Each structure stands twice: as C-alpha cells, then as structure tokens.
Amino acid sequence: MADVLTELPGVGPSTADKLIEGGYLDFMKIATATIGELTDIEGISEKAAAKMIMAARDLCDLGFKSGVELLKQRQSVWRLSTGSTELDTVLAGGIESQSVTEFAGMFGSGKTQIMHQTCVNLQIREKIFADLEGVVEEELEAPKAVYIDTEGTFRPERVVQMAEGAGIDGQTVLDNTFVARAYNSDMQMLFAEKIEDLIKGGNNIKLVIIDSLTSTFRNEFTGRGKLAERQQKLGRHMATLNKLADLYNCIVLVTNQVAAKPDAYFGVAEQAIGGHVVGHAATFRFFLRKSKGDKRVAKLYDSPHLPDSEAVFRITEKGIQD
C-alpha cells in the first residue's frame, strides 16, 4: 500500500508509512481529508497536505457530476427492513444505505429495540432490498454490523431472542456484530474512525449503529460556555459517519435523546439533542413515542425526498412487528 501512496506528489516511503499509520490507507481517504487533518501527522506541512489532497482527488475522479450520473448512482442504494411493514412503507421500502437515519425519543420509546432488530435483519437476505442492476450481489454477501454502545444497553440475549423469533440462529447474528462500549465522546469518535480498519481487514460492514449519539457529549460538555466546543466536536463525528455511509454504501443508524421544548404549543413537545449540527447531518429523522400497550408510533419529520408520515409498530418478544 505504501508503494501506491508514493505516487502522490511529495510522498516518499517514509511519509507513506506515516500516512498509513495515521489511517490514510488509500487515495479516497486522503482525497476526503482536510488539510488540518493531514498536518496533524508529523512532517506534513500545509502546502504538502494541499498537494496530496488535490492529487488524490484527481486520481479518485472527484468533482462535478451530472444529474443523470447521480440518478444512476442512486441505483446503488439498498434498503434494510425495520421489521415493520408500516414503518418500511414510510421509508419507501426500508432504511436506506448511503445515509444517516436518526431515531429520537424518550426512554422506552423503542429506539434500542429497533437497533437490535436491524442487526438481526441484516442477516436475513429476504429483509434486504436492492436493485441488482445498481448493486453487485457480492457487495451484500456476509454483511456485518458495528454497534457502538454509549449507554450500556446492548443485550446479546435480546438479539438471540429476536433472531429465534425470525427463525434464524442467534449465534450467527452475534458472530457478525462487532460491539464496542464507549464511555466518553473521545472513545465514541475513535471507534467510529476505526470502522474503516475493520473494512480494510476484510469485514463487509454494512450497518453502523451509534446508541446513543449525544449522551456522551451531553454529559461532558455542560453549560452554555461549552456548547460551541460540543457542537464542533459533534459535527466532526457526524462528518465521519456520513463519510462511512457514502464511501462504503452502508447504513448508519443513530439513536438520540430528547429534551423538553417549553415553547412548543403545537405538535411535538420534545426536540432531539444536538441542534442544527445533527439536524443538518442526519438524512432521515424520526420521533418515537409510546402508545397503548406494546405499540409505538414513529413519525418521520425530516427527509430530503419523503413526505412527513407516521407508522405504528409493536415491540414483542419476537422483535419489531406490525
């Protein structure tokens, strides 16, 4: 790999080794980096970083595309069932790849249950929907999930229960799910950045879950004085997640906490944590709320192309169902 990176201007074997050590394993990683990120590596100046990035972008053919090309690129998007036909319908067929989907809600609203269910559904070929003209079949073979748990709510026994409810082996699901417990925002961001290492190691990561997105940031950055720092850090984290979704055609799911909205007289009386940073970075945004018994309501309130809509689903022993 070092020999390939030496094709970039100003990159000798020593610099190539430093780039690889810093996680920049290929041209695409360098092409999508910022000058500031590359200058963090010892021995790389701003001028050298700018040259590397521009050359890598040329090699990756990054630039303007026509609307027709983008429409064709959209054919490579695949979808994963949530387990609820009604919720899948709201999403026009299921959760989209190449996007970040947020599920926000109060405790007990079903956020973590949906995350567990998607890990199971990823191992069921009938739950994956793709246009085979745009998606190579091999791309969806042996898919794996990454679950970054920030609240200690991942339960392998619940995954097994859901898998058995779906008629598949729970051990298979667990074998194909990487779990990392993040105790602070630095760990959370590091785990997200390390996902590329798993992919480079031969793991076909197709689902990335952050449960929950903002809890560590919220605990560490308290008070208005630290709000700007929190939002900047959260913005970098969201950029990493969006890049993963785009470059590797995977699904990124995040759960989010909510806060009371005192000035809300109509509609939803809570708002998701994270402000405009999360609002602009998430592709699809849902509010979840409890209903009667085991029923939950999911409201899609932000999407680039789908209308606002609601779906009712149930949380049962077998998992997410209609």
Curated annotation (Swiss-Prot):
Keywords: ATP-binding, DNA damage, DNA recombination, DNA-binding, Nucleotide-binding. GO terms for biological process: DNA recombination; DNA repair. GO terms for molecular function: ATP binding; ATP hydrolysis activity; ATP-dependent DNA damage sensor activity; damaged DNA binding. The keyword Protein biosynthesis does not apply. InterPro entries: AAA+_ATPase, DNA_recomb/repair_Rad51_C, DNA_recomb/repair_RadA, DNA_recomb/repair_RecA-like, DNA_repair_Rad51/TF_NusA_a-hlx, Hlx-hairpin-Hlx_DNA-bd_motif, P-loop_NTPase, RecA_ATP-bd. ATP binds at G105, M106, F107, G108, S109, G110, K111, T112. Pfam families: HHH_5, Rad51. It comes from the Archaea. Involved in DNA repair and in homologous recombination. Binds and assemble on single-stranded DNA to form a nucleoprotein filament. Hydrolyzes ATP in a ssDNA-dependent manner and promotes DNA strand exchange between homologous DNA molecules. Belongs to the eukaryotic RecA-like protein family. This is DNA repair and recombination protein RadA. It comes from Methanococcus maripaludis (strain DSM 14266 / JCM 13030 / NBRC 101832 / S2 / LL).
